[in-house]
Swiss-Prot record:
Described function: Converts holo-ACP to apo-ACP by hydrolytic cleavage of the phosphopantetheine prosthetic group from ACP.
Catalysed conversion reaction: holo-[ACP] + H2O = apo-[ACP] + (R)-4'-phosphopantetheine + H(+)
Designated gene of the protein: acpH
Lineage: Bacteria, Pseudomonadati, Pseudomonadota, Gammaproteobacteria, Enterobacterales
Cross-referenced InterPro entries: ACP_PD (IPR007431), ACP_phosphodiesterase_gpbac (IPR023491)
EC number: 3.1.4.14
GO biological process terms held by the UniProt record: fatty acid biosynthetic process
Keywords assigned: Fatty acid biosynthesis, Fatty acid metabolism, Hydrolase, Lipid biosynthesis, Lipid metabolism
Organism listed in the record: Yersinia pestis
The family this protein is said to belong to: Belongs to the AcpH family.
EC category: hydrolase
Presence of the UniProt keyword Hydrolase in the record: yes
Protein name: Acyl carrier protein phosphodiesterase
GO MF annotations, alphabetized: [acyl-carrier-protein] phosphodiesterase activity
KW Lipid biosynthesis (keyword) present: yes
């Protein structure tokens, strides 16, 4: 899962949106660094990552990537899952529009930015103003996201080429997401993540 799905699952679980979004920018044990509710959000994010990576359907999704891109497929899939969530938001979350959800999330996160790492503050400077989470619904934007990640981290250069697997296997990947994500939603609602 990437930013949007982590925020959505956090909201369903009544977990800290800030903690869930911040988690990738926090190394090691966050205890003592942040208030307990943010620590709980960071820990939920980590559990979601482990759970997602071990799902049989996600393991199946990785098989759609050739050997050249298999190493980066977990990252590519995390971004793709956000694409499918944004694309199917109205179906999956009929009681709240995506713009309304994002406005709420932003209001929960931005007031706390001064107390977060500089890299996280930098991300937030673009995430909201450029409407990244809404634009995840646009497949060309996903290609841009993967290219940008590849440009910033040379060790992940294969991310740019991994978009080919998305184009080639879009429908089966979408079907896998629409099968496993509603289950994760229920688990979040029942605080089983």
């Amino acid at each position: 899962m990437n930013f949007l799905a982590h925020l959505h699952l956090a909201a369903l679980a009544d977990s800290s949106l800030l903690g869930n979004l911040l988690a990738d920018f926090v190394r090691g044990n966050p205890q003592g660094e942040y208030p307990p509710e943010i620590v709980a959000g960071i820990m939920m994010h980590r559990r979601v990552d482990v759970m997602t990576d071990t799902l049989p359907l996600v393991k199946e999704a990785r098989t759609y990537f050739s050997a050249d891109y298999r190493r980066v497929s977990p990252i590519t899939l995390d971004v793709l899952w956000d694409h499918f969530l944004a694309r199917h938001w109205d179906q999956l979350v009929p009681n709240c529009t995506l713009p309304d959800f994002l406005q709420h999330a932003q209001s929960q996160i931005l007031p706390h930015l001064p107390h977060t790492p500089a890299r996280f503050q930098s991300l937030n400077a673009y995430l909201w103003s450029e409407r990244w989470l809404e634009r995840y619904a646009e497949l060309p934007f996903i290609a841009d996201v993967l290219q940008g990640m590849a440009n910033r981290r040379p060790k992940l250069a294969a991310l740019a080429g991994s978009f080919y697997a998305i184009e080639q296997h879009y429908q089966p990947l979408e079907d896998l997401f629409l099968t496993f994500y509603p289950t994760m939603m229920r688990q979040a609602q029942h605080k089983q993540i």
